[in-house]
Amino acid sequence: MPKMKTKSAAKKRFKITATGKVVAAAAGKRHGMIKRTNKFIRDARGTMVLAEADGKKVVKNYLPNGL
């Protein structure tokens, strides 16, 4: 049976660290920033580590061959 293909959309959105954690950009920065606190805007600038359960789902279903 052939290898499962990596999903291109997931390839652009997630990175797998050397320790196996899945990192993604923080959500909530598309619009409506006027009512957000400065702390929220600063924190959303960077990346976040997905919860372990969510990370496993991403790797299993979308990034089977890693990156």
Swiss-Prot record:
Gene Ontology cellular-component terms listed: cytosolic large ribosomal subunit
Gene3D superfamilies, per the entry: 4.10.410.60
Keywords: Ribonucleoprotein, Ribosomal protein
Pfam families given in the database record: Ribosomal_L35p
GO biological process, one term: translation
Residues making up the signal peptide according to the UniProt record: none
Xref: SUPFAM superfamilies: L35p-like
GO molecular function: structural constituent of ribosome
Keyword Ribonucleoprotein: yes
UniProt entry tagged with the keyword Amino-acid biosynthesis: no
NCBIfam families named in the record: rpmI_bact (TIGR00001)
HAMAP family (UniProt xref): Ribosomal_bL35
Family from the record: Belongs to the bacterial ribosomal protein bL35 family.
Name of the protein this chain belongs to: Large ribosomal subunit protein bL35
